C-alpha cells in the first residue's frame, strides 16, 4: 500500500511538472513559429506614419515586424540548439497561408511548442490608444483546453513585459484564454489555436497603433530583441539554461527636455523627442570600441548591441547637437540590459526673441483687443522661467500655450484688453532657454488697442 501511494505521488508530481519537465531532458526541443498576417494585403495591418504614405511597404506593416521578430527568434533558437520551423519565409500573399493550413502544418511538423507572433491595435480613435502586451491560449482563462498552453504563455510574459525601452500604459502582461477574451465567438477561439495539438499560444507583443511604438516597430533591431525575449520564454518553458553565452544591450536615446509633438496620446518618456542620428559606442574595460550603432531617422531613438560578451562596459552616446554622455552598464549571458538615455542639447548662445507680434509703433493702426502675444525664440525655452518673466502693464490675466517644441510662446488674454490703451510687454532677462542660460537684457515692446 505504501509503495502504491509513493508511486502515485511521484506520478502526480511528474504530471504537475508536465511538458516542461518531460522536454527539459530532450536533445532538441522543436519550436514552430508563425509570424502573423502577411502579404501587405487586406488582412495585414498598415499604420501610416510620417514620412511613409498609406500602403508604403517601407513603413509600418504588422507583417513586417512580425517577420523581423520571427527570424530573430529562429536565429537565436538555432544558436541554442533548438529545431525550428516557420510558417512562411517571405512576405507575399502567396505564403500568407490560411489559419487552418498553418495549424495542420504545425501538427504535422512534430513541434513541441507553437508561437504565433503578433502586435495589437485598439481599433479605436487616437484618444483611446494604449500600449501593453497580451498572451492567449485556447480555452477559458481559468480552464485552458491544454494547461501547458497557459504555462507556455506565463513563461513568456516576464520577458516581454520586461522590455524597458518601450513605455507601457499598464505594468502587466495580460494572460487570457481566447474563449474569455472573445466571448461572442463561443468556443471557436482564435484560428491558429483551434485544433492546434502542440503547446500553443498567440502573443500580442505591444500595440502597434500607439504611435511611439509604431516608430519603434519599424526598427528591425528593436524587433530582434523581442525575438530574443521569446527565446528566453522558450528556455524557461523547457527548463533550459546556459545555451547562450552572450547578452544583449538595447537603449532608447531621447532629448532630456524637448517635447514630442504631433501625437495625441503619449505616456511617460515617450512625451519627449527621440534623438535621430546618435552615434552609440560600446566600449570594453580596455577602452576598445567593440560595437557601434547609429540611431536611425525614424524617430525611435533605438540602439541595439547583439551577442555581447558578459562584463562591464561603457556606452558612449554622441550627436553634434548634444553633449556627449557616457553610461556604465553590466552585461550578463543570455540576458537583456536595457538603458534609457536622456541627452542634454548643446545651446551655445543665450536665448533671444527672434520675432514677436503684435508689432506696433506710434502712428500705426491700433491692435485688436483680443490679439494674442506671440514670441518666437532662437532656442527651446525653459517654460516655467519664461512664463514667470512675462509682465504686461496694465496687468492682464491670460493663458500661455507653447508650440514648436517650446520655441514659440503664445499669450492669450482671458478678457479683452482695455480699449484705447497703450500696453507695455516685458520679458525680463530672467528668461531662460532649456540649457539654463538667461537673456542678456530685458526684452520690451509696446502696442496700443483700438477704440472698440
Each language-model region and where it sits:
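Acidic, low-complexity Ser/Thr/Gly/Pro-rich repeat segments typical of extracellular/periplasmic
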Residues: 347-452
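Hydrophobic beta-strand segments
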Residues: 265-266, 278-283, 315, 388-390
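Active-site histidine-acidic residue metal-binding/catalytic motifs
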Residues: 25-105, 109
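Extracellular beta-sheet/turn segments enriched in Thr/Pro/Gly and aliphatic residues
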Residues: 325-349
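A short, solvent-exposed beta-strand micro-motif common in secreted/extracellular proteins
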Residues: 301, 310-321
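Active-site-adjacent mobile loop/cap segments within catalytic or ligand-binding domains
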Residues: 29-34, 41-43, 116-126, 136-137, ...
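Short, acidic Ser/Thr/Gly-rich low-complexity loop/linker segments typical of extracellular
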Residues: 269, 273-277, 281-302, 307, ...
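A short, amphipathic beta-strand motif
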Residues: 247-255, 266, 341
Amino acid at each position: 500500500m505504501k509503495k502504491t501511494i509513493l508511486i502515485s505521488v511521484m506520478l502526480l508530481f511528474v504530471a504537475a511538472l508536465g511538458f516542461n519537465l518531460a522536454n527539459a531532458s530532450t536533445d532538441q526541443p522543436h519550436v514552430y513559429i508563425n509570424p502573423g498576417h502577411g502579404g501587405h494585403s487586406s488582412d495585414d495591418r498598415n499604420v501610416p506614419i510620417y514620412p511613409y504614405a498609406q500602403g508604403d511597404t517601407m513603413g509600418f506593416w504588422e507583417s513586417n515586424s512580425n517577420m523581423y521578430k520571427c527570424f530573430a527568434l529562429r536565429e537565436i533558437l538555432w544558436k541554442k540548439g533548438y529545431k525550428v520551423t516557420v510558417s512562411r519565409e517571405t512576405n507575399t500573399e502567396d505564403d500568407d497561408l490560411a489559419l487552418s493550413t498553418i495549424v495542420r502544418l504545425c501538427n504535422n511538423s512534430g513541434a513541441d511548442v507553437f508561437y504565433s507572433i503578433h502586435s495589437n491595435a485598439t481599433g479605436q480613435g487616437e484618444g483611446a490608444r494604449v500600449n501593453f502586451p497580451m498572451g492567449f491560449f485556447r480555452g477559458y482563462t481559468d480552464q485552458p483546453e491544454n494547461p501547458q498552453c497557459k504555462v507556455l504563455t506565463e513563461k513568456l510574459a516576464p520577458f516581454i513585459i520586461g522590455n524597458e525601452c518601450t513605455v507601457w500604459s499598464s505594468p502587466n502582461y495580460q494572460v487570457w484564454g481566447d474563449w474569455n477574451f472573445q466571448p461572442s465567438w463561443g468556443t471557436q477561439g482564435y484560428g491558429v489555436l483551434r485544433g492546434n495539438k502542440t503547446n500553443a499560444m498567440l502573443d500580442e507583443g505591444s500595440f502597434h497603433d500607439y504611435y511611439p511604438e509604431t516608430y519603434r516597430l519599424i526598427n528591425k533591431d528593436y524587433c530582434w530583441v523581442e525575438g530574443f525575449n521569446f527565446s528566453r520564454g522558450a528556455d524557461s518553458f523547457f527548463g533550459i539554461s546556459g545555451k547562450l553565452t552572450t547578452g544583449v544591450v538595447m537603449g532608447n536615446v531621447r532629448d532630456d527636455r524637448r517635447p514630442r509633438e504631433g501625437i495625441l496620446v503619449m505616456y511617460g518618456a515617450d512625451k519627449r523627442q527621440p534623438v535621430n542620428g546618435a552615434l552609440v559606442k560600446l566600449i570594453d574595460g580596455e577602452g576598445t570600441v567593440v560595437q557601434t550603432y547609429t540611431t536611425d531617422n525614424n524617430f525611435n531613438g533605438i540602439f541595439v548591441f547583439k551577442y555581447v560578451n558578459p562584463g562591464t562596459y561603457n556606452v558612449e552616446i554622441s550627436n553634434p547637437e548634444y553633449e556627449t554622455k557616457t553610461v556604465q552598464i553590466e552585461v550578463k549571458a543570455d540576458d537583456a540590459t536595457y538603458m534609457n538615455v536622456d541627452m542634454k542639447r548643446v545651446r551655445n548662445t543665450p536665448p533671444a526673441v527672434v520675432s514677436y507680434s503684435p508689432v506696433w509703433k506710434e502712428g500705426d493702426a491700433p491692435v485688436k483687443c483680443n490679439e494674442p502675444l506671440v514670441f518666437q525664440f532662437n532656442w527651446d525655452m525653459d517654460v516655467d522661467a519664461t512664463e514667470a518673466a512675462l509682465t504686461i502693464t496694465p496687468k492682464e490675466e491670460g493663458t500661455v500655450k507653447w508650440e514648436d517644441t517650446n520655441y514659440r510662446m503664445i499669450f492669450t488674454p482671458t478678457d479683452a484688453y482695455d480699449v484705447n490703451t497703450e500696453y507695455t510687454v516685458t520679458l525680463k532677462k530672467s528668461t531662460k532657454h532649456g540649457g539654463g542660460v538667461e537673456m542678456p537684457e530685458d526684452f520690451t515692446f509696446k502696442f496700443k488697442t483700438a477704440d472698440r
